[in-house]
């Protein structure tokens, strides 16, 4: 459960991230594909090379969805309901991949905002991404 402090931390970080959605999203996907190459299997129809238009576009979509979750932080389940349906029933993404993506996003945020990425902020972002992952896998059951 996200505390009021966690929510404030997430919103504070997102205020810095939101101006870089395409760049950070693409970097997150690039990092995920490099560190966890098995995740590429869900993107066989994409050019998964660094800087590709498809990766930049999808990275931005991911970040926009996370922005929706931040903007509806008190009701993430409703904000991401359609996306949860899509990932569970159409794309059939293995739920473990959400954790891998979350880890890569935390690394990207820490790399670009090292002074902002305190241990408390790290915990808050990790909890937020865990909540997002739980919501996105909730319809798998």
Swiss-Prot record:
GO terms for biological process: hydrogen peroxide catabolic process. This is Hemoglobin subunit alpha-A. InterPro entries: Globin, Globin-like_sf, Globin/Proto, Hemoglobin_a-typ, Hemoglobin_oxygen_transport, Hemoglobin_pi. One of its GO terms (molecular function) is peroxidase activity. It comes from Caretta caretta (Loggerhead sea turtle). Heme b binds at residue 87. O2 binds at residue 58. Belongs to the globin family. It comes from the Eukaryota. Involved in oxygen transport from the lung to the various peripheral tissues. GO terms for cellular component: blood microparticle; haptoglobin-hemoglobin complex; hemoglobin complex. Red blood cells. Keywords: Heme, Iron, Metal-binding, Oxygen transport, Transport. Residues 1-141 form the Globin domain. Heterotetramer of two alpha chains and two beta chains.
């Amino acid at each position: 459960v996200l505390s009021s402090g966690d929510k404030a931390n997430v919103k504070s970080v997102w205020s810095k991230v939101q101006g870089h959605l395409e760049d950070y999203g693409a970097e997150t996907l690039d990092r995920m594909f490099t560190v966890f190459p098995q995740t590429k299997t869900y993107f066989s129809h994409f050019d998964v090379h660094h800087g590709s238009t498809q990766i930049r576009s999808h990275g931005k979509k991911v970040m926009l969805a996370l922005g929706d979750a931040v903007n509806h932080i008190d009701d993430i389940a409703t904000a991401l309901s359609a996306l949860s349906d899509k990932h569970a029933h159409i794309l059939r993404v293995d739920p473990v991949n959400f954790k891998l993506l979350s880890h890569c996003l935390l690394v990207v945020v820490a790399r670009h905002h090292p002074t902002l990425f305190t241990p408390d902020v790290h915990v808050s972002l990790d909890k937020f991404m865990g909540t997002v992952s739980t919501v996105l896998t909730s319809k798998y059951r």
